[in-house]
């Protein structure tokens, strides 16, 4: 039996700097855009404008340098997952589709981050970009807003002022929905949420029918718990990150824009804010941020960042400046 290696044998060669044992690979924007390789631009300026959220300035350069490389990475991971399916079929000795009808298993992506950070735009961009790959053209996007308890139920529970916190969601219904889709079920329904009414739309649903990829976007989708959580079903996840001070500013700027647009709708829940001046609107937005959105970010959302497969870090101009990707 060979003698065990001694400490001197095991020690790495001196390199002048400590080895990097971080679980992440860290890229600046210039390094990340090189990973696009030869991928062509597949979106037009008009499409980017249509996908852009309030207060954001995403353009074709941002798509080319940030989101095309990300689309390529996810595409490669989807292909790898499909190869695993083939390996399972080889083990079973038959096509899983013949042995288990309806066994189509989609690749599930979670997109998380704070209010106003731009996660919805990221999710929409990923949906469109991933649809352009011929090997997985069916990409569905569902937001967790539809799984918020109805306003009446939130009032009954006394948590209307905790809307957006983990306890305000019907976690069991969300988990059941993603489990059903992941299990290959046909025509799985998700509730629809109205930002105008600030509530679920009674009797209205979207139907997800065996997509190649499902994107689940929401504040708390990377939450963990003592039992199975929706994050346990993700094959890949993205966390959209930024400095807290920048997110607060974006939130206030968005609130002012909504005051001049969506809040003016006759049925808008926040119609009473439509006619207030800039100073008052800014004060209201800052109070909402400080009392609700900031505590939720600090207590519940930000701690889940470490669970993401990839972190998009934005600078003050709302554009991605760094990308962190998990090695493991």
From Swiss-Prot:
Report the InterPro entries cross-referenced here. Answer: P-loop_NTPase (IPR027417), PanK (IPR004566), PRK/URK (IPR006083)
Q: What molecular function terms (GO) are annotated for this protein?
A: ATP binding; pantothenate kinase activity
Q: Which BP terms in the Gene Ontology apply to this protein?
A: coenzyme A biosynthetic process
Q: What is its EC number?
A: 2.7.1.33
Which annotated residues bind ATP?
Answer: 113-120
- Annotated PANTHER family: URIDINE KINASE
Q: What is this protein called?
A: Pantothenate kinase
Taxonomic path:
Bacteria, Bacillati, Actinomycetota, Actinomycetes, Mycobacteriales
Q: Which gene encodes it?
A: coaA
């Amino acid at each position: 039996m060979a003698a065990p290696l001694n400490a001197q044998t095991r020690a790495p060669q001196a390199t002048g700097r400590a080895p990097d044992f971080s679980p992440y690979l860290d890229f600046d924007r210039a390094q990340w855009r090189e990973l696009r390789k030869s991928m062509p631009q597949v979106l037009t300026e008009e499409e980017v404008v249509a996908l852009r959220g309030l207060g954001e300035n995403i353009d074709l350069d941002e798509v080319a340098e940030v989101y095309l490389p990300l689309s390529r990475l996810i595409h490669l991971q989807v292909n790898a997952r499909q190869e695993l399916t083939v390996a399972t079929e080889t083990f079973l000795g038959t096509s899983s589709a013949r042995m288990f009808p309806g066994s189509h298993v989609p690749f599930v992506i979670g997109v998380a981050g704070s209010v106003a950070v731009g996660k919805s735009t990221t999710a929409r961009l990923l949906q469109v970009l991933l649809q352009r790959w011929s090997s997985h053209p069916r990409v569905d996007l569902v937001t967790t807003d539809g799984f918020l308890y109805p306003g009446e139920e939130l009032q009954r529970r006394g948590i209307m002022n905790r809307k957006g916190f983990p306890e305000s969601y019907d976690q069991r219904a969300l988990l059941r929905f993603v489990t059903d889709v992941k299990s290959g079920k046909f025509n799985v329904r998700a509730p629809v949420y109205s930002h105008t009414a600030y509530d679920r739309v009674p009797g209205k649903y979207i139907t997800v029918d065996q997509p190649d990829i499902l994107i689940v976007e929401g504040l708390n989708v990377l939450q963990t718990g003592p039992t199975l959580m929706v994050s346990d079903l993700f094959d890949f996840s993205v966390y959209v990150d930024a400095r807290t001070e920048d997110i607060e500013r974006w939130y206030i700027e968005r609130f002012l824009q909504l005051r001049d647009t969506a809040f003016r709708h006759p049925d808008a829940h926040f119609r009473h804010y439509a006619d207030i001046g800039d100073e008052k609107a800014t004060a209201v937005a800052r109070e909402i941020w400080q009392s609700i959105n900031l505590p939720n970010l600090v207590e519940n959302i930000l701690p889940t960042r470490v669970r993401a497969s990839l972190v998009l870090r934005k600078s003050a101009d709302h554009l991605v400046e760094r990308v962190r990707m998990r090695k493991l």
